[in-house]
Design a protein with these regions (language model features):
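C-terminal functional module detector
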Residues: 22-76, 80-83, 87-137, 170-173, ...
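Conserved, charged catalytic cores of large soluble enzymes
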Residues: 224, 234-236, 240, 325-328
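Substrate-binding cleft of extracellular glycoside hydrolase catalytic domains
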Residues: 124-160
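Ser/Thr/Asn(+Pro)-rich, low-complexity disordered segments
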Residues: 142, 243, 283-285
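Active-site-proximal segments of metallohydrolase catalytic domains
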Residues: 177, 236-256, 266
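Gram-negative bacterial Sec-dependent N-terminal signal peptides
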Residues: 1-20
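Long, charge-dense tracts
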Residues: 219-221
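Long, well-ordered early-domain segments
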Residues: 111-112, 147-198, 212, 238-241
Length: 641
C-alpha cells in the first residue's frame, strides 16, 4: 500500500509537467505502419474460446406432468435462479445451492401434456368431474408415494400409446398448452443476461415406442418472439408423432416459417432396447436410406452421453477389453421395463458403438448420421440441476435427500423395481464458446465443440492434426496453436500434408478446482477396416505416478484414498493437470476413424457415501460407495481422401 501511495502521489505532483515531455499520441496510420496486420494486445481480435462454459441441456420443472406428479412445485423461474447460484428451497424443504453457478441452462419440460399438471394441481373442473381425472388428481394432491404412483401410472400409459382418460390429455393448440408454453418462454427471456448467463428456450419431445426410449430435447437459438410462433411438437396424433423423422420435419418447418434455428439432442439410448441407433432399419422396419442419414446428421449434432438414468458411453458387453466400460450402467430393460434387456440390443444403444456404426453407414449411404458431439446433463425432474456427488437432489422430488432414499423404490413397473441408490449423480455439458450468449453457445453445439462430464468440472482441450509438438503443448498459447495447426474436438482432420505418416493429438486436462485429482487421460479410437468391420482401441496416453503398463498393456489402478465412513478423500495421489501429444501408432490412411479423449479422476466418494455419512442412510450392500468421475470429449474424425 505504501508503494502504491507514493507512485500515485508522484503522478499527481508531476503529471502536468511530465506530460509535456511525452511524444504526441500516434495516429492510427502510424500505428498500422509500426504493427502491420497485428495488434499489440494479444487478446484483440482473438475469437477463440478461452474457457469452457458449463451448463445443463436437460432440466425439468413442475411444468412437466411427471415432475409435478412426483411432487415438484418449483417452476422455471426457480430453476434459473438456482442455476445462477442463488439459494432455493427444494420441494421437500431443504435449502439448496450449487457449489458454483452454471453459465447456461436449458429448461426442457415435456411437450406432451404441457399444462396438464397445472390443471391437476388447480383441481380444474374438467379434471375433477372425470372419474379417472379425479382419481389421479387426488393421488397427486396426497403426495408422497401416492404422487409417485400416479406419475408412474401416467408414464406407463403414455409409453403404451394410451391415455387414462381424455380429460388427462392436453393437446398442442389448446389454451392450457399455449398458456404454459408462453410462460416457459417468458421465464427464459427474463433470465437471459448475455455475457453473464444464458437461458435457452427448449422442450423435450418424449417419444416412447412400445416402451423404448426415443426422447429428444429441442433447443432454440432464438428469442421468445420466434419460439412462440409455433407450438412445440408432441407425440400425440393427429398433429404429433412418435417417429423422429416427423420431429425433423417439424424442425425444418419451424426454421422455414420463423427463419430461426433449432437442434435436437437424443438421450438414454440405454433405455431404447436397441432402437436409438439403428444400422439397417428403423424401429418400424423402414430401411435406412440417404434421406434418413442426411436428415439425422442435419438436426442432431450432439448426443447426451451421461445423465441420472445411466452412463451411455459404452457397455462391458460391447467393450470387454475396457476396464472403465462398466460405469453406472443402467440397462435392465426399456424405459417402462415392459421388455427386459437382451445382449443383441446393446449395439443400438451406446455412443461408442454408434460412432462405429456411423462409419459403416457413411460408407454405404454417403453420410454419417451418428457424427455427434457428446454432452452430459442431469434430466433432473426437481428443477435443480445438481450433478455433484456431495450435492445431489435426485431424479425427482420423491427421491430428494432423505435417510431412506438409497433403498427406496424410485420407479417400479410390474415386478421390476429401480432403487434409489441406482440413480446417477450425472452429468454436465461443457461448451467451448467465445461468448456467453445464445448464439455463441448454440453455434458451438452445432460445430460439436462440446464435451461431457459425469458432474465434475474437469477442463479438457483436445486437438487433432499432423504436426503438433510437445513445445506446442508447453507454450503459453497451446489453444491458439491447437486451432492454428489442426481441428478442435468435434472437427475433422485435414488431409495429410506431404510426408505425414500418422495424425497426432494434443490433449490437456485440468482438475476440477474442488474435485479429485486426475488419474489418467485416454484416447479412444474407433475405425473401419477394408472388409467393412469396425474395431476399437483404448490407449492410455498420459497418467499420474510411476506406474507401468503390464504385459497386456494395461495400466495398474491408481489406488484410492477414499474414507467411506467419513465421505472424504485426499488428493495425495493423482495430478492436478496433465497433457501430452500422442501419435496414433496403428494408423492406416485407408481406414476411416474417429478419436476422442476420456479423462478419468482418482476415486472419490459417491453420493451414497455422503447420504450414509450425513443422514445415517442405510445403503444396500450392492451399492457402490466410490466413483471415478470422468470427461468424454467430442470426437475428431478422419476420412480417407
Amino acid at each position: 500500500m505504501r508503494h502504491t501511495y507514493l507512485i500515485s502521489a508522484a503522478l499527481c505532483i508531476f503529471g502536468a509537467s511530465a506530460a509535456t515531455a511525452f511524444e504526441p499520441t500516434p495516429d492510427g496510420s502510424s500505428l498500422s505502419k509500426a504493427f502491420p496486420g497485428k495488434s499489440y494486445s494479444p487478446y484483440a481480435q482473438r475469437g477463440i474460446p478461452d474457457r469452457p462454459l458449463w451448463g445443463d441441456t436437460h432440466l425439468h420443472t413442475s411444468t412437466s406432468f411427471d415432475a409435478g406428479a412426483f411432487g415438484n412445485r418449483l417452476d422455471a423461474r426457480a430453476a434459473y435462479r438456482f442455476a445462477k447460484g442463488q439459494e432455493v428451497q427444494a420441494t421437500t424443504g431443504f435449502m439448496a445451492r450449487l457449489s458454483r453457478p452454471l453459465d447456461w441452462l436449458v429448461v426442457a419440460d415435456h411437450s406432451d401434456n404441457m399444462g396438464l399438471f397445472d390443471m391437476i394441481n388447480a383441481q380444474d373442473p374438467a379434471i375433477m368431474s372425470d372419474a379417472e381425472g379425479n382419481r389421479i388428481a387426488t393421488m397427486v394432491a396426497n403426495g408422497g408415494d401416492e404422487g409417485v404412483a400416479a406419475a408412474l401410472e401416467l408414464i406407463d400409459a403414455y409409453s403404451r400409446g394410451q391415455v387414462l382418460s381424455p380429460a388427462l390429455a392436453v393437446e398442442a393448440g389448446t389454451k392450457p398448452f399455449r398458456s404454459v408454453w408462453q410462460r416457459q418462454i417468458a421465464a427464459a427471456e427474463e433470465a437471459y443476461e448475455p455475457g453473464l448467463f444464458t437461458s435457452f428456450i427448449g422442450y423435450e419431445w418424449t417419444s416412447l415406442i412400445q416402451g423404448g426410449n426415443m426422447h429428444r430435447v429441442v433447443i432454440y437459438r432464438d428469442n421468445g418472439q420466434k419460439a412462440g410462433m409455433l407450438d412445440p411438437f408432441t407425440t400425440e396424433s393427429p398433429a404429433g408423432s412418435i417417429n423422429p423423422r416427423d420431429l425433423w420435419k417439424w424442425m425444418a418447418n419451424y426454421e422455414q416459417v420463423t427463419r430461426g434455428d433449432v437442434l435436437a439432442l437424443a438421450h438414454n439410448g440405454n433405455l431404447s432396447n436397441g432402437i436409438m441407433f439403428p444400422e439397417t432399419a428403423q424401429y418400424d422396419g423402414t430401411e435406412l436410406d440417404e434421406e434418413y442419414v442426411q436428415t439425422r446428421a442435419r438436426w442432431e449434432p450432439m448426443y447426451e452421453v451421461t445423465q441420472i438414468k445411466g452412463d451411455g458411453e459404452t457397455h462391458p458387453f460391447l467393450s470387454p477389453n475396457d476396464e472403465f466400460a462398466d460405469y453406472e450402467t443402467w440397462d435392465k430393460g426399456n424405459l417402462n421395463l415392459s421388455e427386459l434387456k437382451e445382449d443383441s440390443m446393446l449395439a443400438g444403444e451406446y455412443a461408442r458403438e454408434a460412432l462405429k456404426t456411423g462409419l459403416k453407414l457413411e460408407a454405404r449411404l454417403g453420410t454419417n448420421p451418428y457424427k455427434f458431439g457428446m454432452v452430459g446433463s442431469t434430466d433432473s425432474h426437481t428443477s435443480l440441476a445438481t450433478a455433484q456427488e456431495d450435492n445431489f437432489f435426485g431424479k425427482h422430488s420423491g427421491a430428494e435427500p432423505n435417510p431412506q432414499r438409497p433403498s427406496h423404490i424410485v420407479g417400479q413397473f410390474g415386478d421390476v423395481a429401480i432403487l434409489g441408490w441406482e440413480m446417477v449423480a450425472s452429468g454436465l455439458a461443457a461448451v467451448w464458446a467465445a461468448e456467453n450468449t445464445r448464439e455463441a453457445i448454440f453455434d458451438a453445439m452445432e460445430r460439436k465443440e462440446v464435451y461431457a462430464t459425469t458432474g465434475s468440472r474437469i477442463g479438457v482441450r483436445f486437438f487433432g492434426g499432423w504436426d503438433y509438438t510437445m513445445d506446442d503443448l508447453t507454450s503459453r498459447t497451446p489453444a491458439a496453436l491447437g486451432y492454428a495447426k489442426g481441428a478442435p474436438m468435434g472437427g475433422d482432420l485435414s488431409a495429410a500434408p506431404e510426408g505425414a505418416t500418422a495424425p497426432n493429438f494434443m490433449v490437456y486436462a485440468l482438475k476440477d478446482p474442488i474435485g479429485g485429482n486426475l488419474d489418467r487421460i485416454q484416447i479412444v479410437k474407433g475405425w473401419m477396416d477394408s472388409a467393412g468391420e469396425t474395431h476399437e482401441q483404448v490407449y492410455d496416453v498420459v497418467w499420474a505416478g510411476d506406474r507401468e503398463p503390464d504385459a497386456n498393456g494395461k495400466l495398474p489402478a491408481i489406488g484410492s484414498t477414499v474414507d467411506v465412513a467419513r465421505a472424504t478423500w485426499t488428493n495425495t495421489i493423482g495430478l492436478g493437470e496433465m497433457g501430452t501429444v500422442w501419435t496414433d501408432p496403428d494408423f492406416d490412411p485407408s481406414q476411416p476413424a474417429f478419436y476422442y479423449a476420456r479423462v478419468i479422476e482418482i476415486p472419490t466418494p459417491r453420493w451414497t457415501a455422503y447420504d450414509a455419512f450425513r443422514m445415517g442412510a442405510e445403503v444396500p450392500a450392492e451399492s457402490p460407495m466410490e466413483t471415478q468421475e470422468r470427461a468424454y470429449t467430442s470426437p475428431i474424425w478422419y476420412t480417407p481422401g
